[in-house]
Amino acid sequence: MIKGRFPHMFKPRVYITRQIFPDALDLIEKSADLELWPEDEPPSPEQLREAMADVDGAIINVMDRIDAPLLDAAPKLKVLSQVAAGLDNIDVPEATKREILVGYTPGVLAKSTADLAFGLLLAVARRVVESDKWVREGNWKISHHPMFWL
């Protein structure tokens, strides 16, 4: 045996609570045995506790509440990774007390939020919603003047 190294005789078990990109699944599957929640709706707290009872890690979503009762039901859990910018749904002090590593994706939505904000600003400034409704109602046949929709 080489000192300081441990041969991996098994892959850690990882539970994923939502669909993620196939490329990410392929990458994770190279080093872990995966179990993926198959539904679009989130698992109930009971389903989540049951699924995490024998896993080493989990990739979760902001809709999954990770609290002391869930952590009690997941004695092997060593790492949690949240696919979200915040940690409001995770009892981080409790996870830390149990030496469970917690990761998340801060800033992941910053550009998308900025894009949406500018889109909404343009929609309001150019009256896009009102114009869309007007056209859908068949009013586009009516003549307009230079001050129209200003």
Model-derived features: positions:
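Phosphate-binding beta-alpha-beta segment of Rossmann-like dinucleotide-binding domains, i.e.
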Residues: 98-100, 106-150
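An N-terminal-biased, well-structured beta-alpha scaffold segment characteristic
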Residues: 4-105
